[in-house]
Amino acid sequence: MERPIIFSGPMVRAILSGNKTQTRRVVKKKLYFPTDPGIGYAVEKGRIKCPYGVPGDRLWVRETCVRFTGITFEGGPWPVCGWKGPKHNQNPYQALLPKAGNENHIEKLNNAAACVTVPSIFMPRWASRINLEITAVRVERLQDISRSDAHAEGLHPGANGLEQACGRSWGNAQLAFQALWDSINSKKHPWKDNPWVWVISFSRIEP
């Protein structure tokens, strides 16, 4: 089984660098279990199914990209990251270029009014450059994240030895992940609400 999954630009870069092998997604379905172990047992027995799949299933990444509106390719193709040009014999002006990792090139294109942004939700399957295989799935409270899992989420210490997230340093990995989580989910599912989340571990595979 193959399903799409959306990642932000920073998380795409973390996957491409090999630093991110895990993601947390809010459990949308209400869970009516009196104890935390009861929920884990129900997931293990398949009574509660993860909408992203089970170990062995594959995910293709949807990310923000740009579409060319018209540009003269002089001196050969743009030296871009993770992009092999148009697919399915497309006109290059209809090609989609991933934004993460190509910011400098896209800035030049934007200055020339040569491209428009396409939100990640609209990225078609053929344009995806990242394929993942699910290796493990479990459910837990958001605030139960461990230091090692925060690192698996793509957070790592900087040169000063402190964890880095959202452009600043934090005292520990959990605080860094809290900042990252709220930068994306604070409106609907803030850290303080401690929602149930799917913990999905994955490995990157070749298309």
What residues fall within each predicted segment?
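Secondary-structure transition motif
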Residues: 1-207
